[in-house]
Amino acid sequence: MKLITNGRLITRDASAQGYYEHGAVAFEGTKIVEVGEEAALRAKYPGAEIIDARGGVIMPAFINAHTHIYSALARGLSIVGNNPTNFYEVLDGTWWAIDRHLMMDGTRASAAALYIDSIKQGVTTIFDHHASYGEIPGTLHTIAEESKRLGLRSCLCYEVSDRDGEEKCLQAIQENADFITECEKNKDPMLAAMFGGHALFTISDKTFDRMVAANNGRTGYHIHVSEGMNDVYDSLQNYGRRPVQRLQDHGILGPKTILGHCIHVNAAEMEIIKETGTMVVNNPESNMGNAIGICPVLQLHKRGILLGMGTDAYTNDMLESLK
């Protein structure tokens, strides 16, 4: 038994006491046994190992519902000649340029950096959307090794896209399928898989069909949706459907699927998201940084749509994004 003591405890339990000025948490292994006043728990568990919170706040940890390990080491990076004037140029000139050159050692180092900083920021669970088109096979397994080594919960996927050609696209699809199988086999409670897709403007109908076939209903999808207006324009011009409608056509939506951003969704799309029980993740700091708009979180919330928050790897500090 262990006791976390010497801290102000926020339980977020509306049915009981939500705050203790001098609180403590008793836990054993991975299970929280009891929370309450420090003096009472010290008396109840006299032999417990004490973990001193040093006057800090003891509270439930954060879940980062959308981030990108591949960009963990890019903070402060300047690419010569890259002066983007719109969102597509940000992607093409910065992030795609980085992930095309990311090899396995870079992926491992990026994972370690993001996980360590996440721990420091009170994040214990991440939903990562990875891309390393320099070296694809085995990358999710490598990230999972770092996740287990550092003790975080992770739900991982690989970003499928047509942008670097069919061979790379097929490798990305296979990487998702292989990692889903690995998670099914190992049944590790700290590790899970989703099927990743970049965004609708870089995924053809043929590729969506291949993704659905490879997944075979085993898990949900994690995909960027209407992050920029280019995603909406491309979908309407090339497929005659808005992005959420197109996802519905391919059977991508559902209670196990995460839609990142959803900035430029209309009322009809919101209703589809609600009806299918799909989750939306807001990434406010990233949205402001890329000057692409604001996710209509209040409208989504009023419709009863499940919402989460992510950092999009702009930071690992969830409180900073919450501001």
Identify the function of each model-found stretch.
Residues M1-K44, G56-I58:
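N-terminal metal-binding scaffold of metallo-dependent hydrolase/deaminase domains
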Residues L73-T107, D164-G165, M229-K256, T276-M279:
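Active-site gating loops and adjacent loop-to-helix segments of metal-dependent hydrolytic enzymes
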Residues L77-H129, G134-L152, I173-K187:
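Alpha-helical scaffold segments that flank or form the walls of functional sites
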Residues H130-I263:
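Metal-coordinating catalytic core of metallo-dependent amide/deamination hydrolases
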Residues G151, N215-G220, I252-P255, I272-V281, ...:
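Glycine-enriched alpha-helix->loop->beta-strand junction motifs that scaffold or abut catalytic
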Residues M229-R241, E269-K274, A291-L300, T315-K323:
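Histidine/acidic-residue-rich catalytic or RNA/ligand-binding cores of hydrolases
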Residues D249-K256, L298-K323:
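His/Asp/Glu-enriched, well-ordered alpha-helical/loop segment
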